[in-house]
Amino acid sequence: MPNYDLLIRNGRVIDAESGVDRVSDVAITNGKIDQIKPEIDPATANDSLNVEGQWVIPGMIDTHVHVANAADFGRVRGLGLQMVAAAGATTVIDLGGSMEAMTTGIAARGSGVNVGGLGYLKPGETVPEGRLSPDVITEIVGSALEAGSLGIKLWGGYYPFTPDETSRFISTANNLGGYVAYHVGTTETGSRLDGLREVPVLLGNTGRVHIAHINAYCRGSILPVEDEIQEALQIISELRDQVVSEVHLARPNFTLGKCDEEGNVLADVVSNCLKLRDYE
């Protein structure tokens, strides 16, 4: 009588937490790992997979994905959910999409991945245009949480708020128990090293924030690239108890290239990249 539901055989089992790194068999019962041994009899399992030459790792947690509104391409929702599952992620946080788009995508193409989302703050769409009072900011954050979001996403490189508004969004979300992710940049700074330099002032002594893709602010637009990297690392090291961050690993990355009526790009992100390639 088989003891296990599934046996994954001959894979290189890697687990950073326990320090395991060896070729082993992994036996699974009721969706949970039952045994990890150098060799397990295939006859003891209902099914088996030979994964020789491949890695067997715990599911990854990706804290910065876009699987909600980004799935609008082709009018098909949920494509990103399939992609993150194929990449080995089991838990992801969508940094900037509507809960409606998220739930529609899960219903259409859910891949079994655990998904949480942050409400994105876009003037004229999810927040009022113009300057925002403290009461309005509290209402915006509260509405995002009530809709099912884990918190909010500040897209400073695309839709910047004033430094005071940015700081107040962060502190309000902190006080309401919401998660805050921040693509750096305000009306006074850009999506560059200067925006990152502003973070300690925005947080004060108690603010907490997730700084999105920190390497995006180290492209060499203010200092040489290596100098910007060193300064960025110094900034987040000094804010170790208040800040978490991550990097985007692909060389190309998505940006919003929308222009005004005169052909000028609207997003600071795109403007920075064009200037670095000597475009005017």
Give short role names for the model-derived ranges:
Residues L150-T206, G220-P224, C259-E262:
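Divalent metal-binding pocket/active-site signature
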Residues N69-A71, P123-T126, G130, Y158-F161, ...:
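Short, small-residue-enriched loops and turns at beta-alpha junctions
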Residues V65, V76-Y159, S171-G178, P252:
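Divalent-metal coordination cores built from histidine and acidic residues
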Residues G11, G31, G53, H64, ...:
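Divalent metal-coordination and catalytic microenvironments
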Residues M1-I57:
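Histidine-rich, glycine-flanked metal-binding segment
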Residues L145, L150-G151, R208, H213-E280:
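Active-site neighborhoods of metal-dependent hydrolases
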Residues D94, L154-G157, Y182, I211-I214, ...:
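Conserved beta-strand positions
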Residues Q54-R77:
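Di-metal (Zn2+ and/or Mg2+/Mn2+) metal-binding site signature of metallo-dependent hydrolases
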